[in-house]
């Protein structure tokens, strides 16, 4: 599962950031070989507004394949059990929640002493980015660094993302 989050660089507005994170997550998953990735939104502050914006993008023709929560009531907004079960291919989060989840999932096997699972914090995708940016941290262990290098190789070069500002603005 891809955790679609940033370090706060996608946008200073939580909702706009989460919408962009969804788009960037779709780009990363497709570039990594998933042809039609499913998207879920973590049940956090801003989830319903993000859902509304993404549904509007879909209505306007942007190709988004939404996941269905495993819970009996279903829906696009995912709960904790969906996160643990890997229900969507892409889980959309804000920067704070996403950073927390990245750290928990990557370091839980070591008791938090270093990150032993995952593929790093990349790629950096955004409006006007013309190169692939992959990120690891000083807490990243050798397995995460190796995973990040493998992920970067799989992604090759992500096509330039054009005019996301208009896409986000028009979805509101």
Show where each model-derived region lies.
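Glycine-rich phosphate/diphosphate-binding loop of Rossmann-like nucleotide-binding domains
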Residues: 11-70
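Short, acidic/small-residue loops that bind anionic groups at enzyme active sites
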Residues: 1-8, 13, 63-72, 113-125
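Glycine-rich phosphate/nucleotide-binding loop
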Residues: 1, 78-79, 84-171
């Amino acid at each position: 599962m891809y955790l679609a989050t940033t370090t706060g660089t996608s946008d200073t507005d939580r909702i706009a950031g989460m919408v962009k994170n969804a788009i960037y997550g779709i780009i990363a998953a497709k570039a990594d070989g998933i042809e039609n990735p499913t998207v879920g939104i973590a049940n956090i502050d801003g989830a319903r507004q993000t859902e509304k914006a993404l549904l509007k993008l879909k209505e306007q023709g942007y190709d988004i394949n939404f996941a269905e929560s495993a819970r009996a009531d279903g829906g696009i907004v995912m709960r904790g059990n969906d996160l643990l079960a890997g229900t969507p291919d892409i889980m959309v989060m804000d920067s704070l929640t996403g950073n927390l989840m990245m750290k928990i999932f990557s370091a839980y096997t070591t008791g938090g002493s270093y990150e032993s699972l995952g593929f790093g914090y990349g790629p950096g995708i955004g409006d006007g980015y013309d190169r692939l940016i992959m990120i690891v941290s000083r807490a990243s262990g050798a397995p995460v660094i190796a995973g990040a290098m493998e992920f970067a190789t799989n992604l090759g070069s992500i096509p330039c993302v054009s005019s996301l500002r208009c896409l986000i603005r028009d979805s509101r």
